[in-house]
Amino acid sequence: MTNLKPRIAHKEEVGKLLKPIVVGGDILAYSYVRELNRAFGIEQTIVLAAADIKMLSTSRFTDYRLIPDVHDAEVLYATLEGIAAEFARENPDIVPMVFGCDDCHARMLSEAKHRLEAAGIVVPYIDFDLLDDITQKRLFYELC
């Protein structure tokens, strides 16, 4: 069960304590990065991508990390757990939150939600069983 206790108590702390991690290097990643900066004053968002996308890698708003096998679930999970451990050592009040930029990464993050939450990462996705059910068109239409 997810711990519902807020880890960031005041809106003014969001820009300092929330550390977003975006998986995937496409235009949606850039949108996440810019909107997180605009809305919360987050100076840099970590972006994990398999290729060097210059629009992102050269942006002052990103901490761009090339992870060639980012589409491999175990590589992604280990990378995220390492980042969470890095933040925990730096400041235990930091709240890492991960976002996927495509269906593949959203599914991977949902599937490992409990594992990543155990590492201290906020995973804003529904549990995998429900995600799997509602993203299969035939079953989705039956449910509707």
Positions of the model-derived regions?
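Hydrophobic beta-strand scaffold residues
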Residues: 44-45, 123
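Extreme N-terminal starter segment of soluble prokaryotic enzymes
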Residues: 15-20
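Short, polar loop motifs at secondary-structure junctions
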Residues: 48-55
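A short, basic/flexible loop-to-alpha-helix module at the beginning of a structural domain
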Residues: 2-14
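A short, Lys/Arg-enriched amphipathic alpha-helix followed by its capping loop at the start of a domain
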Residues: 35-43
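Structural beta-sheet core signal
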Residues: 22, 46-47
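Glycine-rich adenosine-cofactor-binding loop
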Residues: 21-36
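Conserved N-proximal alpha/beta basic substrate-recognition cap immediately N-terminal to
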Residues: 58-144
